[in-house]
Amino acid sequence: MLWKIRKEEITLSSYIYRIDLPSLSQTIQEYPNFNFNCLSKAQIQSKEWLIRQLYECVGLSGKKIAMLGGWYGLLAQPLYELCPDITYIRSFDIDPDCANIAESLNKSLLHDNWKFKATTYSVNNLNWKEKVKYHTQKTDGSYQFMSDRFDIIINTSCEHMPDTWVRNVSSEQVIVAQTNDFDIPEHTNRCDSPDLLIEKLGIKTILYKGRLNTEQYTRSMVIGYK
């Protein structure tokens, strides 16, 4: 049972953050390398914060959303719960272990005409300004060519990557960026304030900026346009 595996790691702290528990339990059993840190209190608080502010700033109805450094895609279900008529969500992560786990966790959305789809790809190698052209792996192992447009570009992993991805975002696309000041080796691009994040990404129209203090670190977020 899931709760016997790691009950203390799972915090469902409000109505806005919902996880498909049967899919989560199955995923944990199927993928021994599952990283429970994705369910930490700080991670969930950060996602709830993003969802609330994004919804208030621009809404979600009919939106086409790209998640850069999307990890396990745990934003997808609560976004759809808040707004079921999101057009689609695509998650991109360079880590080859992420896509299968993300699709297992979001199985119902994957099977619903690919409302959610995860792809292994470097986000710095894609042009977000136009139709994004890439190949994604299907469940049978074959690859399908994709050509997707996006209204919203979400990157909650800015501390893990250089800022080159933002060069390929247009001034008409909403940027949602999160980073933190947690000092560990894999955080090669840390940022300790929303103002510094705005400067680094070249955000010119600011819809929201703020900080979230967690037990582990302070997280900065900005929503806006270049």
Model regions: which residues?
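Structural motif
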Residues: 64, 88, 151-152
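Short beta-strand element of Class I
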Residues: 86-92
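Conserved class I S-adenosyl-L-methionine
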Residues: 60-73
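S-adenosyl-L-methionine
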Residues: 1-62, 100-150
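C-terminal substrate-binding/active-site "lid" region of AdoMet-derived donor-dependent transferases
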Residues: 162-226
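Conserved SAM-binding loop of SAM-dependent methyltransferases across substrates and taxa
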Residues: 72-86
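Conserved SAM/SAH-binding beta-strand->alpha-helix loop
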Residues: 94-97
